[in-house]
């Protein structure tokens, strides 16, 4: 999938994956979904769910490092700054052939334009927080969040999933490469 097509789907994910309400119990349910999958898959990840003013859920699998926690901080900062997914920002920047510093004068020490940070949006209220995963390749970090949100909110995962990175056969049977 080309960057522009990916970007359109990233925008669609944000439009569809919204909550009617969001509180500590919902944060716990979302975090538990992500934690159970991480455990089942053997993922070495950090999971962070927060309202912008405070953390609501934090889990770290054995083997993660402070580096993963720093990625979480930077991804959450990006979501809070732009009110959209960190992966969407990365795609917009890639299309424009810019980075965070060139486009927004933001330091990569504090912001990340990598997949794995997603806005928590409440219908009628807007973006109130973020969910972030760090420890997998960025596209997988992002997709883990999308899968959990689809499960929790009752949406079709296939309709909102990015194509996997790597080589695959397209609808015409031609093998194509997908970058993340």
Swiss-Prot record:
Top-level taxon in the UniProt lineage? Bacteria
Checking InterPro entries in the record gives: PduO/GlcC-like, PduO/GlcC-like_sf, YBR137W-like
SUPFAM superfamilies recorded = GlcG-like (SSF143744)
One Pfam family named in its UniProt record: HbpS-like
Q: Cross-referenced PANTHER family, in alphabetical order?
A: PTHR28255, UPF0303 PROTEIN YBR137W
Q: Which HAMAP family match?
A: UPF0303
Q: Which family does it belong to?
A: Belongs to the UPF0303 family.
User: Which protein are we looking at?
Assistant: UPF0303 protein PSEEN3311
């Amino acid at each position: 999938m080309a960057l522009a097509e990916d970007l359109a789907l990233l925008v669609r994910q944000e439009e569809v994956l919204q909550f009617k309400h969001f509180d500590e119990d919902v944060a716990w349910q979302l975090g538990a979904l992500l934690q159970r999958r991480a455990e089942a898959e053997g993922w070495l990840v950090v999971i962070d769910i927060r309202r912008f003013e405070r953390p609501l859920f934090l889990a770290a699998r054995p083997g993660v490092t402070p580096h993963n926690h720093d990625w979480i901080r930077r991804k959450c900062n990006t979501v809070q700054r732009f009110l959209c997914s960190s992966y969407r920002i990365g795609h917009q920047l890639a299309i424009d052939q810019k980075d965070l510093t060139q486009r927004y004068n933001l330091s990569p020490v504090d912001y990340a334009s990598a997949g794995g940070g997603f806005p928590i949006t409440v219908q009628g209220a807007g973006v109130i927080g973020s969910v972030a995963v760090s420890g997998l390749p960025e596209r997988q970090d992002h997709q883990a969040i999308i899968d959990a949100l689809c499960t929790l909110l009752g949406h079709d995962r296939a309709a909102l999933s990015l194509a996997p990175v790597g080589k695959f056969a397209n609808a015409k049977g031609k093998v194509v490469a997908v970058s993340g």
